[in-house]
Every structure is written in C-alpha cells, then in structure tokens.
Amino acid sequence: MNLEKLSKPELLTLFSILEGELEARDLVIEALKAQHRDTFIEERYGKYNISDPLMALQRDFETLKEKNDGEKQPVCTNPLSILKVVMKQCKNMQERMLSQLAAAESRHRKVILDLEEERQRHAQDTAEGDDVTYMLEKERERLTQQLEFEKSQVKKFEKEQKKLSSQLEEERSRHKQLSSMLVLECKKATNKAAEEGQKAGELSLKLEKEKSRVSKLEEELAAERKRGLQTEAQVEKQLSEFDIEREQLRAKLNREENRTKTLKEEMESLKKIVKDLEASHQHSSPNEQLKKPVTVSKGTATEPLMLMSVFCQTESFPAERTHGSNIAKMTNTGLPGPATPAYSYAKTNGHCDPEIQTTRELTAGNNVENQVPPREKSVALAQEKPVENGGCPVGIETPVPMPSPLSSSGSSLSPSSTASSSLTSSPCSSPVLTKRLLGSSASSPGYQSSYQVGINQRFHAARHKFQSQADQDQQASGLQSPPSRDLSPTLIDNSAAKQLARNTVTQVLSRFTSQQGPIKPVSPNSSPFGTDYRNLANTANPRGDTSHSPTPGKVSSPLSPLSPGIKSPTIPRAERGNPPPIPPKKPGLTPSPSATTPLTKTHSQAASLTTAEDLASSCSSNTVVANGKDVELLLPTSS
C-alpha cells in the first residue's frame, strides 16, 4: 500500500483503525491501573488510619525515628517529597498565571486606547454632521417644491379623469344599447339554431335510414360477392375439368391414330386372306358350302387371340366402322366365306365390340330370318351373354353370304346412344341421367343437346380421375394384378370368397345343365330395383340405332342399381397410363372433397362382388348359328 497516495476513504479507514488502537491501549492502561491500585494503597497507607490522630502521631514518630537512625529504608515513599513536588507545581502555575495576567492587562490597555480613538473620531463625525443637516434641510425644501408640483399635476389628472369618466359613461350607454341589440340577435340566432337542430334531427333520421339501407345493400353486395366467388369456383372447377378433358381427348386422338394404323394393317392382311380364299374356293359352289358341317371352336382365355384391340370406353369408333364396312363389303360380294377363320371380338374394357357383334348378328340373322320364327328370335336376343374380364372374348361362327347389303343404320353412330352406353356401363352412373339420356336417344337417335354432351364429358373426366386414383393406390400397395385380367376396379379376392364363388359356379352349371325347357324372354321390367329404363329404351329404339352401344343384356354393371350381376367396363390400365396433370387453381378456392375421397367397400360387399366376378369369369356364353338355328353354349373357363 502506498501511504503517500491514499484516497480520502482509505485515510478515513486508516485513522479509524489508529483511533481504535489508541482507545484499546487506554483501556488496557486503565485496567492495569485498576489492578495495581489496591496493592499501591495497601503498600503506602496500609499501616495507618488517616482519620485516627493517634495513628498520625505514631506515623510521624516513626518517620522521625527513621531519620535519626538513617539506616533503615522506609517501606513506602515519603509524603513530604510529594508535597514538595506539589508546591513546586503550584509555584509554576502561579508564575504562569501572573504572566497571563500581565498579558491580559496589556490587552486591556490596548482596548482603552482604541476606545479613546473611537471617541475622538465620533467628535469629528458630529462636527461634520452639522454640515449634513444643512444639506438635508436644503434637500427637504427641494422635495416640498416638487411635492407642490406633483399636487398640481394630480389636479390636472383628476380633471382629465373626470372627462374620461364622462366619456366612459357615454360609451357605457352606447354599449348597453349594443348589448340589447346583440341580445335580440342572440335570441333570433337561438331560435334559428333550434329550427336548425330540428332540421338536423330530421336529417339524422334520414341519415340513419340511409345507413340502414346502405348496410342492407352492403349485405346484398357481400352475398353477391359470395355468389360471384362460388360461380368463379365453379368456373375454375369446370375449367380444370375441361383441361382434363382436353388432355384425355389428345391422348384418345393419339390412341385412335395408332389404332387406325393397326386396323389398316389388319385390313390389308384380311384383304390378302380374302383374295387367297377366293382363289382357293373358285371351283366350289355356295350350295355345297351350306351343306358342309359347321365347325364350332370353344375358345378359352388361354388361347391366343387373332384380332384383339383394347381401347377406352369413352373413345369413338371410326376404325370399327371401317372394319364393319369391310366385313359388309366382303359379304356383299357374294363370294363364299372361309369355314375355319374366326372373327374375334374387339373388347371394350372386357366386353365384346358391339359393332362387330351386331354385324355378325345381322349377317347371320338376315340369312336365317326365314327359317327361325319371331319368338325364337326374341329368345335368342334375351339369351345373349356378356363376356366378362376373365371370360373368352372370341365368338366363332360360320360366315354365310348375305343376300342383301347391310343397311346404313347397322353401322350408324348417335351421340345419345354413346352417352347412354357410357353411362349405363359406368359404376358411377345415376338412374336419372340414364333415363334422360335413353329417353332422348329413343326420341331422337341422331341428336344430342350440348348440355348432355357436357354432362357426358364431365362424367368421363370424373370417372377417369377416380380410376387413376384407385390405380395409384393399388400400385402403391403392391396389389396390382396382370393387365389381361385386371380390366375393372375390383377388390382382391381372398381364399374364402374364391371357394364360395366356385361353389356357386358349380351350382349354376348344374342348374343350367338340368334345365331343358324353353327359355322365356326377359321382360323389360324384370329388374329387382324397379323399371329398367335401358330395356325400355332399347325396345323403343330400332336395332340399327343400337349398333354402337352395347345392349342391356350384354353390358351391365353390378354396382349400378339398374342391372346387377355383371361388372361394368372400365378403361384398361395398360392403355390408360398416367392421368393428365390438373391445372392450378386460384388460392382462394378449395378443391371439392369428393375428388380425394377414396371409394371403400365393406367385407360383405366385397364378397358379393367377388362372387359375381368369379361367376362371370368362369362362364362365357357363345351364340353359334348352326344350320339356321341358334345354339346357346355355356362353357366353363379356367380361372
């Protein structure tokens, strides 16, 4: 610690420490003195009692005796020496006090001299004070004169004040008149203000009414805005659906172009085959060909198909019409047809091509029309069976030359029949739309309104969306079946459902084999869910108008309430591919929840559907014309 450079708080702490040490030392000294005081008094005055005169005399005697002896040392100190010391100190104090007294006397003398000087100075001041009084008298006279002047000035000011007061009185009277006039004007103004207040109240009431009307108009405007947003959302939804339709139509156009190319190649090959057959059968006559036995081939799903074309259900059929016209040309030439080659039906999602099948029925029906009665014709039409997913798609017949050319109605296409066929074969079709479309096709087969076209296109877009979502879910779960069998969205069959389906198939086969009576035609109102409007529409339409759309006896859907039992055709997964991208919508619009909700089926529904699927896939019906008669063959196929 540097003692030369200490701050003030450090010095204070140091001084307090030193002071504490000094106080401690004094306390220690006092304690030691208190301890030795009793011993000191005992040593010095222990022998004598000061209050007893006898003891005092004895003490003095002893002291004198000691002086006389001189040999003995007193035990305690001699009090005479102490008294001498005290006397010396008193003398010193006396001398000191005398010196102080002399100093006080000298100071007193100085004070007296100062007082004398002050007295002389005061005398001089009094002498000078006479002159001051004279000057003060002169000053007083001057001030009196000034006072007189001020008094005269005050009088003048008073006169002026009187004049001003009179003027003020006049001004006051004038102001009173003005104030009375202002009061009258103020009353008038208050009356006007009251009137204006009443007017303002009326205007405020009008304003409230206007505000209420404006609020109502704002509410209406908000409602209109909501309607506008809803319509905008609907328009956006329609635009997205139209974009999806456009992409689908582009894909369909590409598929149609590829299909036309393949059909042209097939047509060229068929022309070559026909030319070869004409060259080989030049020497044979048509009568000999009719007497030859009919060859019936029972095709199963394992046999290779000669002519197989798979396309979407929503596609049009320009290539099929070409193919049908080629068949009509071949039959119109009157040349003999081959006995062994067979025309295989092109499948539309698991169903036979309606145009080729209708052409076959027309060529066979025109030849056998004179031999078969009308009742047998209706029975044969009612006995036509559809080809399901796992069934045999090939129907084989003996081509017979047709004496008369085909009418144009056999290959005509109407948009209403296309819409009705697509709606009736769809799992999402509704009976009301089916009834309307079939009614319109029955009334005017060649015409379809733009509203029905829009409904048809929108329905196909929605169905494509749902099927693509279902296929993506099945691909993600690893449950995808082969494309030759998976032509409709079905659930996976378990072993119990398959066993039950096989049992039902055997029962149905035994029932069909044991049945020998004539088969009655199906009534148009035989649907378990009420009137089957598709049968009514097909009975109302001529046969030529329904050549494009499959008949109700051939194509039906187990999921639709109008015709249960047979699975609806869907788009093949091999040709469908990935769905077109959905265009982005506005951020304020939310997608409809129906587009993202997957279709679910309960276990009982799945069991019933798998039973119907196994029944339809294990049995295939082929109608063969042999010697002018319709032969119905029910053939079990390999599952």
UniProtKB/Swiss-Prot annotation:
The modification Phosphothreonine is found at T570, T590. Pfam families: CortBP2 (PF09727). Residues 87-285 form a coiled coil. Residues 405-430, 467-477, 587-600 have a biased composition (Low complexity). GO terms for cellular component: actin cytoskeleton; cytoplasm; FAR/SIN/STRIPAK complex; lamellipodium; stress fiber. Residues 387-430, 463-490, 511-609 are annotated as: Disordered. This is CTTNBP2 N-terminal-like protein. The gene is CTTNBP2NL.
